[in-house]
Amino acid sequence: MLRNTILCSAAALLLVASLTACGNQDNTSSVVSEESAPSSVAEVKYENINPLTGENNLATSAKGQRPIAFMINNNPSARPHWGLCSADVVIEGLVEGGSTRMMWLFSDVSNVPKIGSLRSMRHDFVEIADGFDAVLVHWGGSPQAYTSVSTNGVDELDGLSYEGSYFFRDSTRNVAIEHTGYTTGENILTLMEQKEIETKANSQYASPFTFGKPDEKRTLTDGTCKQVDVFFSTAGYNHTFTYDESDGLYYNSIEGTPMKDDNGQQMAVTNVIGLYMNVSTIAGDGSGRVDMDLSGGE
């Protein structure tokens, strides 16, 4: 089964996709399909494919719905995260100061548990969310991000406007207030209805991912990769994904420590995608915010 995806890069972005999972999962991931003998068995129809993971497990009520994207704090004080192992796709990229921020994507907002801690958006992530036709959930943002929201017409929900009603603070960890913001899928769904935000996916939208059929046999042809090291520019944000042959998943550690959610489950994924791109400091920005070149790379 295809599990959640994380995206990171030594230079800028890390994408972990096809599902972020925690714990043991069945291993049916693959890269190249094998030819099979003709069969008289009727072809199975998959009517509930999750467009972010390729799995045939999307609730009927979520079919044709827009994904929801959450801006997530990745400061060490914000770990362990609430809801990490529930995300379909995790995208991580550089922000100012050499630190990273994450954007988690969900195909079904009703499945979003307590999630956080939430942080402010950056313009690069606004563009990525727009590319997924997603509703962007965040707590504040940079001037460039708010400009991008306006320019691109991105639907967004800002915790600064709804603190105490749909967005909340959890002070039980005794950390700085910027590491305490959270919400839930139920709150976001209610707020979207209140604000009359379109929930149906744009008819012109196509998933950026191409998946095989859930039961399609696959075999790897480009060798074995038992470990993936992802280095950002600053200590505290570097990952190691270690392959486990028993379940076919890559288990994520950050700075040598298993990356776990608030329930104590380690993040494990099927696909790790690294994107290398140019990153530059925005001229005249007093906070040293950066711009990731999303128009190219490899």
Predicted regions and their residues:
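Bacterial N-terminal signal peptides that target proteins for export
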Residues: M1-S9
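Bacterial signal peptide processing site
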Residues: G23-D26
